[in-house]
A protein has these predicted regions:
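Short, recurring structural edge motifs at helix starts
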Residues: 103-115, 136-137, 155-164, 187
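Cytoplasmic-side transmembrane-helix entry/capping segments in multi-pass membrane proteins
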Residues: 5-10, 163-171, 192, 219
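Non-cytosolic membrane-interface motifs at loop->transmembrane helix junctions
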Residues: 30-40, 139-140, 189-194
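Secretory/periplasmic and organellar redox-cofactor proteins
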Residues: 1-123, 127-128, 202-221
């Protein structure tokens, strides 16, 4: 049912954003991380690319049904058949559990090396206040940029919103200039400058894209 898919997305994306917000403010406000909050935020963040892929597929399905003359609101709540040959691939029901699990985990997302490297840089930024110390004027800015870069990079794993990775360019520019505004040690300058350049450079490769997304293919760059 389309409404169920949209409800799933509405539950995942906003709740994921709230969890990430708590992770951003915790070290700044209370000076430490919460293990349970980190686990919850990681679980929600990993679901965001899958939720976005499902929402896009649902919207495209509703558009196709509307163009076919079906009332989209009725289709939204009751469902409908889609375009196609109507043939059933019986071999799909005979696959091994491992193959099915792999298809479930890789459906709608790919793992380009550039985004995986961006995730690594983001985690490095989030942990950098541990050696920069929270007394450093730039520590909070580095931590926030790391959390935002992690969110952007994980979300961009969804092929249909791969262009979202270019938000890391903005984060990279902020990192490069943050120590100049707030001040900091030489180590802080080097950390921000290196991480900023890495984030900007890693946005260039798009990486492989799996599947076809209809009209959205033109936006996958």
């Amino acid at each position: 049912m389309p409404w169920l898919t949209v409800l799933f997305g509405v539950m995942i994306v906003p709740l994921g954003a709230v969890s990430i917000f708590f992770i951003v403010i915790q070290p700044i406000v209370i000076g430490t991380y919460s293990t349970l909050a980190l686990i919850a935020a990681a679980a929600m963040l990993l679901q965001i690319p899958y939720a976005i892929d499902e929402i896009v597929a649902t919207v495209q399905f509703l558009i196709r049904r509307h163009r076919a003359g079906r009332p989209w609101l009725l289709v939204f709540f009751t469902g409908d058949t889609d375009e196609g040959t109507g043939e059933i691939d019986r071999q799909a029901f005979e696959r091994k559990p491992g193959v099915i699990l792999r298809d479930m985990l890789s459906g709608g997302i790919t793992l380009p090396w550039s985004l995986l490297a961006s995730i690594g840089v983001a985690l490095w930024l989030m942990l950098s206040p541990l050696y920069l110390t929270w007394d450093s004027p730039v520590a909070a800015a580095v931590h926030i940029c790391g959390a935002l870069a992690l969110t952007v990079s994980v979300t961009s794993l969804a092929s249909v919103v791969r262009m979202a990775r270019f938000l890391n360019v903005i984060i990279g520019v902020v990192l490069i200039f943050a120590p100049l505004v707030t001040g900091g040690s030489v180590l802080a300058y080097l950390t921000c400058f290196a991480a900023g350049l890495l984030l900007i450079g890693l946005t260039v490769p798009r990486g492989p894209v799996g599947g076809h997304y209809g009209a959205m293919n033109a936006w996958i760059r």
